[in-house]
UniProtKB/Swiss-Prot annotation:
Biological source species: Arabidopsis thaliana (Mouse-ear cress)
Stated role: Exonuclease that digests recessed strands of DNA duplexes in the 3' to 5' direction but hardly single-stranded DNA or blunt-ended duplexes. Also able to digest 3'-protruding strands and 3'-recessed strand termini of duplexes containing mismatched bases.
EC number: 3.1.-.-
Subunit annotation: Interacts with KU70 and KU80. Interacts with RECQL2.
UniProt keyword annotation of Metal-binding present: yes
Gene disruption phenotype: Early flowering. Loss of post-transcriptional gene silencing (PTGS), but not of transcriptional gene silencing (TGS).
The name this protein goes by in its record: 3'-5' exonuclease
Gene: WEX
SUPFAM superfamilies: Ribonuclease H-like
Signal sequence extent: none
Domain of life: Eukaryota
Amino acid sequence: MSSSNWIDDAFTEEELLAIDAIEASYNFSRSSSSSSSAAPTVQATTSVHGHEEDPNQIPNNIRRQLPRSITSSTSYKRFPLSRCRARNFPAMRFGGRILYSKTATEVDKRAMQLIKVLDTKRDESGIAFVGLDIEWRPSFRKGVLPGKVATVQICVDSNYCDVMHIFHSGIPQSLQHLIEDSTLVKVGIGIDGDSVKLFHDYGVSIKDVEDLSDLANQKIGGDKKWGLASLTETLVCKELLKPNRIRLGNWEFYPLSKQQLQYAATDAYASWHLYKVLKDLPDAVSGS
C-alpha cells in the first residue's frame, strides 16, 4: 500500500508535531509547578524481535480520543496510593519478546501455540486470562470512515506478547477460536467497544471480556472512567507513554515499525499486568 492511499485520512506531519508540542508544554508546566524531584527513571531499551522468524454494532465513525485527566472525587475507602504521588514515573515498557505475525500461516501457527500455552495457565475452574488490545487506522476527516481493525495484540505473561497484523492475514480459524473461547477472559480498557468493532469488521466476537475500568472502580472505589495510562500510574506508579505519532499513525502499513510493535505490545502487557494487580485487591468498602 502506497502512502498516498492513507496519508490524507490521518493527521499531517505538521499536525502531529503540533499535538506533541502542546502535550510536551503541558507536561513541562505540570512538572515545573510541582516540587523539584530527581529525573524520571529511564528503563533500558529492549530490542524488538518482531521482524525475526516466529518461534514457537459499533458505529463506523468510531474514533480515537486523546487522554483525559481523571478529576472526579470518590466517597469510597481506597487502597493506599501514597506511594504513587510523585509526578515523574518510570516508563511502563514491555521487556519480553514481541512476536509479530504478518501472514495467515504465521498467525494461524502462533494462535495454535498460544492455545496450548494458555491450557497450562488455567486455574482450578478452567479459566485463564489474557491482556488484549486492537489498533486501527483512525480517521479525522468528515465523511471518511476509520480503517478496519489492523492488529490484534495478545499478552499472556511477561515473557511474550503477540502482535498479529490481521489487516493483512485475516483471522484464521485458530485465532477465531482463541478470541471466541469463553473460558479465556480477555482484559483491557474499553474492551467491550473493541469487541463490537472487531465483530463489525470481521464477524468475530471477543467472548468473555472484563473492562479494567469497571474492575478498578470495584476495587478502588468510585465511578471513574479510567484510561489505561491513568490506571497504570495509579496502580503501579509507572507512565504509559502514548506518543501521538504512533498512536494516531497508520496501523495498516506493512511492515509495522519497531516503535509500533513496542507500543502495541506494551498496551496489551499493561492490561495483563494491571488485571493481575486488581484481582488481588479486596473490593472497596462504601463509606463517607
